[in-house]
Swiss-Prot record:
Residues 1-12 have a biased composition (Basic and acidic residues). InterPro entries: HD, Homeobox_CS, Homeodomain-like_sf, HTH_motif, PROP1. It is linked to Pituitary hormone deficiency, combined, 2: Combined pituitary hormone deficiency is defined as the impaired production of growth hormone and one or more of the other five anterior pituitary hormones. CPHD2 is characterized by pleiotropic deficiencies of growth hormone, thyroid-stimulating hormone, follicle-stimulating hormone, luteinizing hormone, prolactin and adrenocorticotropic hormone. SUPFAM superfamilies: Homeodomain-like (SSF46689). Residues 64-74 have a biased composition (Basic residues). Belongs to the paired homeobox family. This is Homeobox protein prophet of Pit-1. Possibly involved in the ontogenesis of pituitary gonadotropes, as well as somatotropes, lactotropes and caudomedial thyrotropes.
């Protein structure tokens, strides 16, 4: 008898252990309800699960990635900017002694002055490129219109020079007349070759004077001394 009582007492315990796995229906409403056995042992955590540290810090940032350093921005007073600009106008590439002298005058460090000169040179190059960019689309004829007119012809004259008049040679009257007409014709033809007809030169150019004519050497010594 005692053995049967023990078996009946153990039967509901076995049902209670499996009741946390399958839902039971409520007797009044018929809706499924789940009963949790408080006597069940708690779940064990595996030794390798969740053992690593969290990547995120309590402040919300990641531990593995360092924070970026914030740059210290230097502000210049109007007096300092004026001194730096005047020094930049004199020399765009100052040496170490010039930078140290400028640092004493402005109260800034030599490294700050060196960085300012680097930024100022980069700014000037950017301004020059922005000025030359519109001129790159112009044609050569349009670009020549920007040049002054005086550079087009540096050797031009304001007014044309007066025409040069031909004077007779001083030895033409002293020479005796030749009896033969062939010699006179040759002499006149020679003078025409050496003295071409003078035309008015174009404006801005001086005419080149012709060389002097050759004197005839067919004169007799007695007549030339008389």
């Amino acid at each position: 008898m005692e053995a049967e009582r023990r078996r009946q007492a153990e039967k509901p315990k076995k049902g209670r252990v499996g009741s946390n796995l399958l839902p039971e229906r409520h007797p009044a409403t018929g809706t499924p309800t789940t009963t949790v056995d408080s006597s069940a042992p708690p779940c064990r955590r595996l030794p390798g699960a969740g053992g690593g540290r969290s990547r995120f810090s309590p402040q919300g940032g990641q531990r593995g990635r360092p924070h970026s350093r914030r740059r210290h921005r230097t502000t210049f007073s109007p007096v300092q900017l004026e001194q730096l600009e005047s020094a930049f106008g004199r020399n765009q590439y100052p040496d170490i002694w010039a930078r140290e002298s400028l640092a004493r005058d402005t109260g800034l460090s030599e490294a700050r002055i060196q960085v300012w000169f680097q930024n100022r040179r980069a700014k000037q190059r950017k301004q020059e490129r922005s000025l030359l960019q519109p001129l790159a689309h112009l044609s050569p004829a349009a670009f020549s219109s920007f040049l002054p007119e005086s550079t087009a012809c540096p050797y031009s004259y304001a007014a044309p020079p007066p025409p040069v008049t031909c004077f007779p040679h001083p030895y033409s009257h002293a020479l005796p007349s030749q009896p033969s007409t062939g010699g006179a014709f040759a002499l006149s033809h020679q003078s025409e070759d050496w003295y071409p007809t003078l035309h008015p030169a174009p404006a801005g150019h001086l005419p080149c004077p012709p060389p002097p004519p050759m004197l005839p050497l067919s004169l007799e010594p007695s007549k030339s001394w008389n």
